[in-house]
Every structure is written in C-alpha cells, then in structure tokens.
Amino acid sequence: MRQLLAWSLAAAAALAAAPALAPTAAAADAKCPKLGTSWYGNNRAHLQQVIDAYGTCSGHRGAVAAFDWDNTVTKNDVTDATLSWALRHNALPRPARWKDTSAWMTDAGDRALTAACGTGAGGSLRTSDRPKCTDEIVEIREKGTTMSGAAAFAGTWNHRRTVPQYAWVPQLFAGRTPAQLSSYAAAARTEALAAPIGATRTLGTHTVPAYVRYYDQQRDLIRTLQRAGFRVYIVSAGSEPVTEVWSRGVGIDAAHTIAIRSVLDHRGRITTRNEGCGGIGVNKGDVIPYIDGKRCWINQDIYGIKGPAAWQKQPWKQRIAVGGGDADTDVTFVSDATGAHLVLNRNKAELMCRAYDDADGRWVINPMFIEPLPRRTDPYPCSTTAYNAPDGGHTPVLRPDGSVVPDQADTVY
C-alpha cells in the first residue's frame, strides 16, 4: 500500500503536468496496455503501475519479468501431470539399476524400487498394471521416502540449490529423447485441460490432481507485459521439454523458458545429468533452478553473468522488474525483483514471511485464483524456523540489515 500510494501520487502529478492535446485513445492503448482481469484487493492497480512505470507507457523497453510455472501460471503441477500420464501409459524406461537414477539414491530406495518395479535396461516399466511400482515412484517424488517410510535419498546437497526428488523426475526419463518427453507432456496437457476442475485420479494408492488450468489472470498479465515491451521468462524446477509444451500456451517460446536441462548422449537421448550454473558444470542434479538456483539461471541466461557471481544478488539494473511465484522454491528470484514481487498464497512459510513483512512496499499477495487455500490458523514461524538453510536446517528469516522478521499472520486468503 505504501508503494501504491507513492505511485498514485506520482501518476497524479504527471497527469496534472500533461499537455492539453492528448493522443488518440487507440494510440494510448497501444502505448499503455492495460490488465483486463480481476485481482484481489488493489493488486491489479499495483501491477498496472509497475507495467506503466517500466514499460512502453513511460518510453521503456526490455525490462524483464520472470515467473515460476507450476501453481503460479497454472493451477497444479505440469511435471506431475506428465509423470502421471507416463505411469499410466508405460512410458518410463526401465533402468539397469535404480541406484543409477540418482546420485543420492539410498540402498533402501534401490531395494524398494527393484522389488516393486524390477530392473534390466531396455524396454519400458509396466507401471500401468504394477500399482506397487507406481506407488513407490509417486511416494518418492512426493516425499523422498519409500512406501515403508525409509529415506529414498541421503547424502550431502545444498538445500537452496537442489532437492533430489525434483532432479529425479527428468532422470526417470533417461533413455528417452526430448521429443518423446514433449509428446508425453502434450498428451498429458490435453488430458489435464479436459478434466473438470477438482478432478482427481488414483495412482497406486495415491490420490493426485487430474486437472490443470491456465490462470486467466496470469495469461492476461503475461500478455500485457509483453505488449508493454517486457521480456517475459518462465523459470521452473520442472523438466524443460515439459515446461516448454505448456509455456507456449501463454505465448512464451522455448528461448524464454528456463527449467532443468538434461544433458543428451551421443544419440540424442536424455541422461541422468543436467546442465549447471554459476561456475558448476554438468552435474547429476547438484544444481537446478531451485530457490537460489532460480536466481543463478536468471543471472546467467538472461543477463549473461557467468561464474560464481551468478549466485549473487545483482545491482538494480541487472535484476528483473517483476517476479512471480507461489512457493519457497521461488523466494530468492521473486525477492530480487525491483518493481513487484507477486506471490500466490499457498501457505509456504519462507515466501509468505517475506511477502507479509513487505520490507520494500512492493510485495503483491494474491490468493490462488482456483480453489484457494483457507486461512492458515497459526502465524508463519518467521522468527524461528521459516528459512530453508543450505544444510537442510530451518532458521529465522532475516532482513537484509540482519534483523529478524517477526512471525506473520495469514491475512490474504
């Protein structure tokens, strides 16, 4: 609200000083494209003022807006929708050893997957008629544990740069080509868009969403930003061929879609390795576009910042103008935005602590547009455990000056 008032006063002053002869309505609309959908509270006005200030309405072009994909631009997770389709259509290749699918796979995870799914390179997993195999894969994807509760992943990793079960999904498709994975994603997209809102399906013993929807408000926001001269990117911790299939639906091409990029073998097939960032080369999931990794890929791929510097917050002119996300995975790059930090409230503690603290007056909080969550009853534990530390611990959320963010009540739902 503080920033909205400031922008409103500035806009009023500009109007008072404007010459009497105004451009035609059509010319004004082309220069100053407007949002056309409804938002919570004053959010539409807040976003519009950022668009006007950074875009063609003020004579500017080239500002960057970046959005997470899953549960930010769409309701529900498109990587999960693709995995669901693959499990029901026997599309996953059978690995020679489950241990080889992840650098962090435990003996317990290997045993559980081997018992439920089998091994032996070549052919496909018969997941459509092996519910125990499907169960193990879905449980590991969702929780990082086997159906018996044993840890599926163990070892050391930077918890602000990766999470093994996110990196594992592209690794499950090792042996397939990007074109094959794209075709699975396209089939899953058709199926998920046709399913009614609220629909679920059963995978093994798991109940999962059966539908996905593009948010009308986000589609309109992206289109308006593009018309106003912004360069709009998607930055996702999903698999890049999957995300590209969906991002085309909001007018964002592959060149502006950043996600986990699997390295291909000499025959053009996906491997268990992925491209790196920030001075870290090809790796087996050590760094992906996840929390601080999203900042790294934005700095590297959009602003051309190479080496370890890509992990660092950049000066004002080398940061995005608008950032949008829904989860702790997005908190770093959304915080970096200079104009608006757009958050869809999914009750994710670290992100919501930053949003409700609103240290710079530029945070824009919106309930999910479809099936929004109810109000969180307890305050977010910002002063104690909301920050996701690199070693996997949970510590207080700190402001740039080192002060602790106090616990925050959930007020936008």
Go through each PLM region and give its residues.
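Non-catalytic pre-domain segments flanking phosphatase-related domains
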Residues: 3-11, 18-21, 25-69, 77, ...
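Short, intrinsically disordered, charge-biased short linear motifs at domain edges
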Residues: 17-21, 367-370
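C-terminal cap/substrate-recognition subdomain and adjoining C-terminal extension
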Residues: 29-45, 56-57, 62, 159, ...
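A metal-dependent, Asp-based hydrolase signature
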Residues: 79, 86, 94-208
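Generic secondary-structure boundary signal with a strong preference for alpha-helix termini
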Residues: 82-83, 102, 241, 248
